[in-house]
UniProtKB/Swiss-Prot annotation:
The lineage of its organism: Bacteria, Pseudomonadati, Thermodesulfobacteriota, Desulfobacteria, Desulfobacterales. Keywords: Ribonucleoprotein, Ribosomal protein, RNA-binding, rRNA-binding. Belongs to the universal ribosomal protein uL23 family. One of its GO terms (cellular component) is ribonucleoprotein complex. This is Large ribosomal subunit protein uL23. It holds the Pfam family Ribosomal_L23. InterPro entries: Nucleotide-bd_a/b_plait_sf, Ribosomal_uL23-like, Ribosomal_uL23/eL15/eS24_sf. The keyword rRNA-binding applies. GO terms for molecular function: rRNA binding; structural constituent of ribosome. GO terms for biological process: translation. One of the early assembly proteins it binds 23S rRNA. One of the proteins that surrounds the polypeptide exit tunnel on the outside of the ribosome. Forms the main docking site for trigger factor binding to the ribosome. Part of the 50S ribosomal subunit. Contacts protein L29, and trigger factor when it is bound to the ribosome. Signal peptide: none annotated.
Amino acid sequence: MNVYEIIRRPVVTEKSTIQKEENNQLTFEVDKKANKVEIARAIERIFKVKVLDVRTSTVNGKFKRRGKVLGKRRDWKKAMVTLAPGARIDFFDGV
C-alpha cells in the first residue's frame, strides 16, 4: 500500500489540538486496513519525523436522516500518533 493511501487527512478538533500542544500527539484519519507499523512508517516517510507511538481506533459512522430516507455515514479509522520530543510537523502549526 502506498504511504499516501494510508494517511488520508488530519483530524483537527478541539481535543486533537489540545493533544498536539500538551503531548506532541497528532491525529489522522487513516485507511481502515492499515496497521500501526504501516501508519508509523508512512508518517515518518511523509513528514520526516520520528514516531514513538501509534494508537488506533475505529469510529462508527453516524446515522443521518434526510426526510424519510435513512442513511449512514461510513466508518473510519483514527490514528493518534505520538512524535519524539522536539519533533514537529509544520503543517499543523497555526491551526
